[in-house]
Amino acid sequence: MSQFHELTIKKVSKDTDKAVIISFNVPQNLDEIFAFKAGQYITLKTKIAGKEIRRDYSLCVSPKSNELKVAIKKVENGLFSVYANTLLKANDVLEVAPPKGRFVFEPIKSTARIIVGFATGSGITPIMSIIKTVLEEEPLSK
């Protein structure tokens, strides 16, 4: 079972009319714990109306960005997604578990390959992380 850490929200930005991007401040002493590979996700935990809620969200930035960001699409009647899109703001605190997941991309700098990714809807978020990683770390790939 993952250990959760309290992280402060750095910024909540409206990405579309139905989605926000949440950026977290990661204290320096937790940098190693929150290091991730492109394609991984984090689990967010909070209490809403007295009930503990956990949701997994893919990271949507490259590991080299030194940022921890997730995109959350508002889902009708989605308890956490509605909360995130309407109430969360900078300086709020959420409990966050370290990155997990096996849908990862490991770049090879000297490789030249053609990479194609398909995704729809909010499934684009891990692909965004992978695309950014390819562009930053595999300069010979397309």
Q: What does each of the following model-derived ranges do?
A:
Residues 82-142:
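FNR/FR-type flavoprotein reductase catalytic core
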Residues 2-92, 97, 113:
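Ferredoxin-reductase
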